[in-house]
Amino acid sequence: MPTLTTKIKGSNNYFSLISLNINGLNSPIKRHRLTDWLHKQDPTFCCLQETHLREKDRHYLRVKGWKTIFQANGLKKQAGVAILISDKIDFQPKVIKKDKEGHFILIKGKILQEELSILNIYAPNARAATFIRDTLVKLKAYIAPHTIIVGDFNTPLSSKDRSWKQKLNRDTVKLTEVMKQMDLTDIYRTFYPKTKGYTFFSAPHGTFSKIDHIIGHKTGLNRYKNIEIVPCILSDHHGLRLIFNNNINNGKPTFTWKLNNTLLNDTLVKEGIKKEIKDFLEFNENEATTYPNLWDTMKAFLRGKLIALSASKKKRETAHTSSLTTHLKALEKKEANSPKRSRRQEIIKLRGEINQVETRRTIQRINQTRSWFFEKINKIDKPLARLTKGHRDKILINKIRNEKGDITTDPEEIQNTIRSFYKRLYSTKLENLDEMDKFLDRYQVPKLNQDQVDHLNSPISPKEIEAVINSLPTKKSPGPDGFSAEFYQTFKEDLIPILHKLFHKIEVEGTLPNSFYEATITLIPKPQKDPTKIENFRPISLMNIDAKILNKILANRIQEHIKAIIHPDQVGFIPGMQGWFNIRKSINVIHYINKLKDKNHMIISLDAEKAFDKIQHPFMIKVLERSGIQGPYLNMIKAIYSKPVANIKVNGEKLEAIPLKSGTRQGCPLSPYLFNIVLEVLARAIRQQKEIKGIQIGKEEVKISLLADDMIVYISDPKNSTRELLNLINSFGEVVGYKINSNKSMAFLYTKNKQAEKEIRETTPFSIVTNNIKYLGVTLTKEVKDLYDKNFKSLKKEIKEDLRRWKDLPCSWIGRINIVKMAILPKAIYRFNAIPIKIPTQFFNELEGAICKFVWNNKKPRIAKSLLKDKRTSGGITMPDLKLYYRAIVIKTAWYWYRDRQVDQWNRIEDPEMNPHTYGHLIFDKGAKTIQWKKDSIFNNWCWHNWLLSCRRMRIDPYLSPCTKVKSKWIKELHIKPETLKLIEEKVGKSLEDMGTGEKFLNRTAMACAVRSRIDKWDLMKLQSFCKAKDTVNKTKRPPTDWERIFTYPKSDRGLISNIYKELKKVDFRKSNNPIKKWGSELNKEFSPEEYRMAEKHLKKCSTSLIIREMQIKTTLRFHLTPVRMAKIKNSGDSRCWRGCGERGTLLHCWWECRLVQPLWKSVWRFLRKLDIVLPEDPAIPLLGIYPEDAPTGKKDTCSTMFIAALFIIARSWKEPRCPSTEEWIQKMWYIYTMEYYSAIKKNEFMKFLAKWMDLEGIILSEVTHSQRNSHNMYSLISGY
């Protein structure tokens, strides 16, 4: 081969352009190989010729990292050119010119404010030079000094461009003359005037030539650094690379090492790393080395080892190809200088061998990717999430407003502007320590007791470390050190002892490893905000995983005691508290104000400026000390905040580290709790300040609601209260750094005094709105009557708009059901949860109709709605019932009533005249009999109505049950001494079920009998009279139902809505025709209950892939249309089989009885006999998964796969007059086999795969010819042959 220019060292730092004749891209394998080749070359621009793509197939060309693609394609699979532009740059096209037949495309635009035009040409074989000449003349107006002309010209431009001596023909001479007239020159020949360099080898002629060219304007040659020929094995052409003088950015792109998690699946790698850890500690763990330094050194050491192992593994994988490629280059070089027929044949053979090896490797990678989709497609998982959310573009900051307010595109100035902004943001450190102390003296914070402090300070245990490591989320970006969560989980047995010692040293010495202070900040633009303003970017911080492990342990500890410090007004990150508490609270306050005649109130939603980023570390430490936190726990927090730093990453480059002198650490599990504790100081100050008057609702004064930095303040006498509130916030800000954004803070003002309203508007910096305020994702309205319009009408509109956007998504009806569950249901549940007011039935009917249209893609439903709502008969694929979910959410308030929680102010203030303890006597209690709700009750009356209705439908007494509390109103009215009830609750239990009724009264356990002997005799007589009464015994002697358990047993409200929904579905069940029963009628069988259960289980367990399960679900649920069914729909008399057999086309006939289908089923049973599996030829087995009792259990998985593969092939030719072929069936089985193999490897379930497939693999391979194996790439994945 001719001499190839050596790749320039560091050329990836420069703009580069590659031109390549790809010789067809209709093969997916070829497209994958092109993607790999491009990633290795990493050009800024890639110009492809001969893509052979038709205009309708343009979407085939997609390359990760080069999303901007300009194409010119014809109507046939010939010609075709494309220009791909790297995501690393911002190219702004102004002019695009295309050839209709796909022979050229021209783009003109700007890059870094410089003009650039690229003309990509593929010349036809006939009269190529004439075509090039005519094209240049035609586009002369667009050719300028900044123009680059590239492509396959199909002709040499110089006699040196051929390996044999021949003069240029007349057309080529004319072309070169036109080029001279236009001041164009061959850039390669300019750089290498005497070098022989070739891009094309003609195998039939055994000749080399350079027919691929890059042409530039003579006056623009100073723009280019070099040009080189790039070897490419996936085409019969080599590529050309042109390197510009322009840097991609002003500075070296930052390489950040990240662990390749696939290494962790390699047994040799795992064993090697375990040994390295052990050896490292043996040699380096001594008294001379501090543990923080030892830990950081070990990470650096392991990083080096992993890099070496990765390189070694890659080298092993590519050794064979590299050897062949080196040999090929040597042969081509010899052949170019002295042609020889035998060598030419060897070159052709060698190229074929390399292509075969690379193709096989590409197929393997494709299959690995396909197996991932095979497992996850149509499930509630990443593929569906990506479909609904759309593609998120790579974020490039190409322009920004500098400190003067001017837009700059200079990369260096962009970096300086961003770094300066965040340096100012994070480096504001207040030194007024005395003022901080004075503020904290004035507003005392609650303290933890000694037991709580002792728990915080107890030594960190290995169990805590292991629990946190196990809970780490996987498949997430690692921190600056590159070690992922999977690394810690894989080597936890080796790392936990080291981390335990490290954390002990930190507890004692208060010094962290230096890597614990590091973080990388990535900037994400806020949606629908001006991206040229730096404040409109959201900084996302990545900490190292080891630092997160320590911080998570500290967070877990403080979480247990946070309620002792934080008032129930704060609900963010507090166990047992939810965001909708504050929404309901705000609505109840608004409702209360609306009912008042004399109004003089204000509700203010405060917006804090960068609240998390401005918290002062000295103040935070002082607050923690005042809260009683001290000792090792406090020392560790001090260490965490002693010298944190962060590198901001802009366009792939890490900027110089900035110190983080203020703000809680982003991405740190401990930060939310520290922020809450600091903000509690302000909340406490607002509560204590008498001049800030809250709103008195009955016996409750309501002043404030908080969730993280979202704060709402409720005040009366707004004229004076707002002044005091602002003064207090300013005083707080002076010691904490907290600042209110007055322009974004909004308020409702309630007053009938117009003069007072005018004064308040003039003196208050907040925006006083008349209609609504956005708060925690819902719209608070000034009057509660507008809640439905502003929240639920808008929700309906949002859902319908989402469904409209998703109508063309490429997924099946099952995938669409899961999209509804994944994207629509959470949105609806959140809104129902926040505002559970009465909603008209029409709202749900409209939504159900829109969802049904979406699921069936505007076609008539194939499966009854009632079937899809029954998890048992639909194979686990259920359509969510929004109305039932809404009812479940409305009813769930009853759970909080039963708990009688003192923290639920949101509930108590709805009816201020009601005794708060009444709520605790409503659920399964006597208080429910006399409760009277006000007509204007927003939430509680509606909850009570639905609760009673549900209990009656379930035939459960809502007043007295086994779950009635020992402290119920029934027993309270007996005037039992409080100490008696307390003793029973502590020693026996809190319900009548625990205490026992009738003969079991206080004698179910030895402890109960002991308590009975200690109770006052009068109390015992009273309790006996109630517990042994006939009515009590009749209603409580049974065990509690699932419905009763939901409201009385769980200590947490986690999963509450789902549990209520499940129980409501049982009573809301609408009877539908069971499809398995219909199959029984058609098969002349009556299935037993066990067979029904077998079929239902088969629907869920026949495969882990939903693609495979879908076919079984469709078959069992009778999804497919038949001639008989269509004849009824169209009211026609023709119900004959579509395959042309002349028989009546029932569903059973189409699947099984048709004489054109029977040969396939004969082949299936022939395979079964070869596997030594004896099954009767009963259609219920392959169609429904109902096996005979004596069927071999261990072989059912194998059989099911064979049957479902056959169903796929029969369905594929459903209306075609042909017999489904055995070859197609074998190919389908092989596809499933391949997908399950890669899935088993990934999940470490190879033995299970082997048991299922080993015998069947051999039979399949014995049934196919050698040519079929080659054409379908069918080789044993188990043995490798």
UniProtKB/Swiss-Prot annotation:
| Biased segments, Basic and acidic residues type | 329-344
Q: Which SUPFAM superfamilies match?
A: DNA/RNA polymerases, DNase I-like
Positions bound to Mg(2+) 1: D607, D709, D710
Enumerate the spans annotated as Reverse transcriptase domain.
505-780
Question: Which catalysed reactions does the entry list for this protein?
Answer: DNA(n) + a 2'-deoxyribonucleoside 5'-triphosphate = DNA(n+1) + diphosphate
Q: What keywords is this UniProt entry annotated with?
A: DNA recombination, Endonuclease, Hydrolase, Magnesium, Metal-binding, Multifunctional enzyme, Nuclease, Nucleotidyltransferase, RNA-directed DNA polymerase, Transferase
Q: What ranges does the record give for the region Carboxy-terminal segment, renumbered to this chain?
A: 1103-1281
Q: Name the segments for region: Endonuclease activity.
A: 1-245
Q: Mention any additional remark.
A: An active LINE-1 encodes for 2 proteins translated from a single RNA containing two non-overlapping ORFs, ORF1 and ORF2. ORF2p is described in that entry as a representative of all ORF2p potentially expressed by active elements in mouse genome. ORF1p is described in the related entry AC P11260.
Per its record, how is this protein called by name? LINE-1 retrotransposable element ORF2 protein
Origin species, per record, is Mus musculus (Mouse)
Q: Which classification does the entry list for the species?
A: Eukaryota, Metazoa, Chordata, Craniata, Vertebrata
Q: Which gene encodes it?
A: Pol
